[in-house]
From Swiss-Prot:
Cellular localisation: Cytoplasm
Organism: Sulfurovum sp. (strain NBC37-1)
Protein task: Nucleotidase that shows phosphatase activity on nucleoside 5'-monophosphates.
Gene3D superfamilies assigned to the protein according to its UniProt record, in alphabetical order: Survival protein SurE-like phosphatase/nucleotidase
Residues engaged in binding a divalent metal cation: D12, D13, S43, N98
Name of the featured protein: 5'-nucleotidase SurE
Amino acid sequence: MSKRKQILVTNDDGYESEGLLALVEALKPLGDVTVVAPTTEKSACGHSLTLTRPLRFVEVSEHFYKLDDGTPTDCIFLSLTKLFANEKKPDIVISGINIGANMGEDITYSGTASAAMEAVLQGIPGIAVSQVYMNSGASIREFGYELAQQSIIKLVQKIFEGSYPLPDRKFLNVNIPPIPAAECKGFKSTRLGNKHYGFHAEVHYNPRGLEYYWIGLPRLEWMETAGHTTDFEAVKEDYISITPVQLDMTSHSDIHNLEEWLNK
């Protein structure tokens, strides 16, 4: 009799996030699910690893832990080195369901994507999944996570029944359009798009007159680009975007030009 698959789950919205709980519910029929998630929201923490303070696992329920003040990367790193230290490693790591998009340059900030990145660094298949929303989350309140759940079930089943579609040190970045499941046109392989973030920070003053800042993001502007369909274009057209992301950020096409420039 074959052993049940081992699935490790995390996120960057915190252990109480409805997106995380929806993901866990979808994955339970597919294998044994272990959850290790941050205690609080860690959005935009990137691939941050905590090196200056101690971290502690807190058991919330069976096979469900919060990592006290840890980042998503901490969650994966410590899970693989401690919780799974004497056992078979997870068959897959899934990060999400993030509340909000992680498209284009978002992934350089994203704790959700970075958890999948840490998984593939450790030699384990990784998927980051994010639910795009509209109108301050109204689309999630209306449609829930049904499409995201259906999508991740299909992807994980396909991987478990066949193989992971990418070579080492590459992960899948999945973005779910903000539509009812019945209106989705299917999956589309994409590349990362480009966006203009702009600059925005609110200045305030405390009762002592000292200034402090809140970093905010204005309305994001997607940049139209030629070539293969981008993630934001696919989502805009009601497709589920799946982007293969590699950790090697070398601009290989520029190496020769750089050598020529150095030798001038």
